[in-house]
């Protein structure tokens, strides 16, 4: 499947995604396609409380996967939406997202299209990923903020390097001495 990007108004990504899914299902039910807005989980602080929120991975972009982009483009063109700005093009044809870029994005997201929380263990400047979507992508982590529970990762998109924050759970290894000093209640 080939992947393409649609440029839309910021904040309207989910609305455009839902509209396109309905249009494609109605006008082209036999065609294989996928429309998604990748998201990332993130810890944010509001009024002193830590909240887990979802943010769009690439604001203003909706990703379309299909082998029939011209047909899907015609459906979009005939049912104009004020939220769609344009389809990204390369010269006179549609700009295809590089297979290496999209494969990493697809591997990182879950079935709901979200990059979830990864459990990490930081010991003496060395990062060990215990589980989560980053388990096979240690090399894309550029910075860890243990206090905020965030990791800055590098994701290539449309031939550009994008740095985005995602949620991580920072684990600690306990020394035997600290375990012995704990008080147990019965």
State the predicted function of each range.
Residues 132-134, 144-149:
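Short, conserved beta-turn/loop elements at beta-strand boundaries and strand-helix junctions
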Residues 2, 130-138:
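Short coil-to-beta-strand transition motifs
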Residues 1-126, 152-186:
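Acidic-enriched and Gly/Ser
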């Amino acid at each position: 499947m080939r992947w393409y990007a649609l440029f839309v108004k910021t904040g309207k990504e989910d609305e455009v995604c839902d509209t396109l899914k309905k249009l494609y299902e109605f006008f082209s039910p036999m065609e294989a396609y996928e429309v998604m807005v990748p998201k990332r989980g993130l810890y944010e602080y509001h009024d002193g409380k830590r909240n887990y929120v979802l943010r769009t991975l690439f604001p203003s972009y909706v990703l379309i996967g299909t082998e029939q982009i011209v047909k899907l483009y015609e459906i979009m063109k005939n049912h104009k939406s004020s939220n769609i700005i344009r389809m990204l093009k390369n010269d006179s044809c549609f700009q295809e997202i590089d297979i290496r870029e999209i494969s990493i994005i697809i591997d990182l997201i879950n079935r709901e299209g979200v990059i979830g929380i990864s459990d990490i263990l930081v010991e003496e400047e060395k990062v060990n990923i215990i589980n989560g979507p980053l388990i096979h992508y240690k090399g894309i982590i550029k910075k860890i903020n243990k206090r905020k529970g965030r990791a800055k990762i590098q994701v290539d998109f449309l031939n550009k390097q994008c740095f985005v924050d995602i949620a991580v759970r920072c684990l600690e290894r306990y020394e035997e001495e600290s375990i012995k000093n704990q008080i147990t209640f019965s």
